[in-house]
Regions:
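Structural motif marking the loop-to-transmembrane transition
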Residues: 1-2, 99
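Metalloprotease/metallohydrolase-associated module, dominated by Zn2+-dependent proteases
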Residues: 2-46, 50, 60-82, 116-172
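Outer-membrane beta-barrel translocator/channel fold
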Residues: 53-56
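Active-site scaffold of zinc-dependent metalloenzymes
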Residues: 68-103, 110
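Active-site recognition of the HExxH zinc-binding catalytic motif
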Residues: 100-116, 121-122, 126
Length: 172
């Protein structure tokens, strides 16, 4: 029985190493931007998520072999569960207007670190948007807001059945 455990550990360790070896780490400047966004999460009361991002995640700037195989053409970031490898794409640095929007992306990825699926992550982030200070009034015209609203609507349509038109955000 112990040998089975040893084989499983060896396979998982090899898989993790292969994800790291086939991708590049973030630069020091990119890491600084990531840490600033994680501080926003801490400040908004997402200490569990921020702690996981600080202590568990291995941030990468290029796709590993698995992400190249699967593809993430519209993503700002991608998480490899259960390994904690988070690929941060150039769009993460290009399109979010500030650290609050980058924190929103990292909050989403933190749910994947815990094994949650895309539908759950989108749902939880949309519920938490006010807590982050990510509001329609301030961010409603940003690319990230529009993308996230579109993706959340596609995965969780019942969150957008309010208002006179029956298609408005029920949290607004």
């Amino acid at each position: 029985m112990l040998w089975i455990f040893g084989v499983v550990v060896a396979i998982l360790t090899t898989a993790y190493a292969s994800l790291l070896l086939t991708s590049e780490p973030v630069t020091p400047r990119e890491r600084q931007v990531l840490m600033e966004a994680i501080q926003v999460l801490d400040g908004a009361g997402f200490s569990r998520e921020a702690s996981a991002l600080r202590r568990v995640a291995s941030f990468r700037r290029t796709d590993n072999w698995w992400n190249r195989h699967v593809g993430h053409p519209t993503a700002y970031a991608a998480t490899n569960f259960p390994f904690g490898v988070i690929t941060i794409y150039p769009t993460f640095f290009k399109y979010p207007v500030d650290e609050i929007e980058r924190a929103t992306i990292l909050l989403h990825e933190s749910y994947h670190l815990f094994g949650d699926d895309e539908k759950f992550a989108l749902h939880r982030v949309w519920l938490a948007k006010d807590r982050l200070g990510w509001t329609a009034l301030r961010y409603g015209r940003t690319r990230l807001w529009k993308n996230t609203r579109e993706w959340t609507l596609a995965e969780n349509p019942r969150m957008f059945t309010c208002g006179e038109d029956g298609q408005s955000d029920c949290l607004e």
